């Protein structure tokens, strides 16, 4: 009784302190973020950013896979950027592992050609505040009299 192995990959996306982890497996094209469909992502203005990989690559590439995404940390915008990165990385990893190298290369080229941050994390972090001023670089005004 040989059971078919579950074809799945797990990828993460990061932006500032937000982390999104995507579990990608064979399925019917469901994409859920913290248990809710991707079409109901809030805030509505940033919804297109979350579905960007799907719009770029076409829905047909996502019909054979189910994605479950858990996201935590950061703010609204950072979470959306972490989600889109983890979706893109998970699809590339799934195609590399279970489909073929040619399809994976096509997907990767499309994504990198549009926006490199879909596959590569943004290393910028908030600079810590220093003494003698209100922020990291701003100084208190100097008075001569």
UniProtKB/Swiss-Prot annotation:
Name of this protein: Small ribosomal subunit protein uS9
Xref: PANTHER family: RIBOSOMAL PROTEIN S9, SMALL RIBOSOMAL SUBUNIT PROTEIN US9
Disulfide bonds: none
Ubl conjugation is among the record's keywords: no
Keyword list, A-Z: Cytoplasm, Ribonucleoprotein, Ribosomal protein
GO BP annotations listed: maturation of SSU-rRNA from tricistronic rRNA transcript (SSU-rRNA, 5.8S rRNA, LSU-rRNA); translation
Entry keyword annotation includes Cytoplasm: yes
Superkingdom of origin: Eukaryota
GO CC annotations on file: cytosolic small ribosomal subunit
Family statement: Belongs to the universal ribosomal protein uS9 family.
Major location (coarse): cytoplasm
GO MF annotations in UniProt: RNA binding; structural constituent of ribosome
Location relative to the cell: Cytoplasm
Organism: Gossypium hirsutum (Upland cotton)
